[in-house]
Amino acid sequence: MEFITPIVRPASAAAGGGEVQESGGRSLAAVEKEHMFDKVVTPSDVGKLNRLVIPKQHAEKYFPLDAASNEKGLLLSFEDRTGKPWRFRYSYWNSSQSYVMTKGWSRFVKEKRLDAGDTVSFGRGVGEAARGRLFIDWRRRPDVVAALQPPTHRFAHHLPSSIPFAPWAHHHGHGAAAAAAAAAGARFLLPPSSTPIYDHHRRHAHAVGYDAYAAATSRQVLFYRPLPPQQQHHPAVVLESVPVRMTAGHAEPPSAPSKRVRLFGVNLDCANSEQDHAGVVGKTAPPPLPSPPSSSSSSSGKARCSLNLDL
């Protein structure tokens, strides 16, 4: 990890080098450093115990400590990225058999606002100029960094520009909403027309909801499943308790007037032969009465008569 640390130098010494810049009486210079290790802080590291546990392998490698000669521990001085010094007491706890940094650590946690999951990095200087100097840095955990990004970077979804506007948008009175969505770069699709009984309520809901939604979004597509085409319903006519679906071109032909003939003192109602073959469904004629043989032979092939005893 590369650290940039301000170094205090006299003004006369800083004036001779081009790599050193003065800023408010302090000169900034790049110091070569060696990264030692990282420690992801736990809830107990940033809790009320006010101590940071150093992993044993890193503690024995970089901060060797003789517990017999240093019962109270050592004071380690660090510099952060701004050059601010930090001093921690480093010691070994026999109860937990761990290496910890205690005094001064709680102040570092409060100032840097460390939370569980954040990472603390430790480094040391390299070369004659930075020999014996220790450095400390920190960074947020990845999920916090992602949460701080603007929502457009995390949830942006670019839709293809080939999706057209719905051709039925202007038929529902949403021309203004579609125009507003087009100006904002949104894809504004409206559902097809439904039954007339819900048309008034649907228009009112769409006029309120879609206009506000089109103004709030910059690029949005709304899809609706098309409704099946409406079927043509014909009124059903019931004749003699039999449902019949009436269609055009099948009207009942007008009935021709019947003929009445008086034969041998008996009145006969005679119907035309064409009317016998074009009877209407549902109408039944009374059963014919037997006629005398002489009358049936004389009227054969001309008309069928029924007796009407109207004496």
Curated annotation (Swiss-Prot):
InterPro entries the record matches:
B3_DNA-bd (IPR003340), DNA-bd_pseudobarrel_sf (IPR015300), LEC2-like (IPR044800)
Chain residues forming the annotated DNA-binding region: 37-142
* Subcellular localization, as worded in the UniProt entry: Nucleus
Query: Which parts of the sequence are annotated with region: Disordered?
Result: 275-311
Question: What is one cellular component GO term in this UniProt entry?
Answer: nucleus
Transcription regulation found in the keyword field: yes
User: Origin, by domain of life?
Assistant: Eukaryota
Q: Which residues form a coiled coil?
A: none
The UniProt GO MF terms for this protein read: DNA binding; DNA-binding transcription factor activity
| Name of this chain's protein | B3 domain-containing protein Os03g0120900
Q: Which organism is it from?
A: Oryza sativa subsp. japonica (Rice)
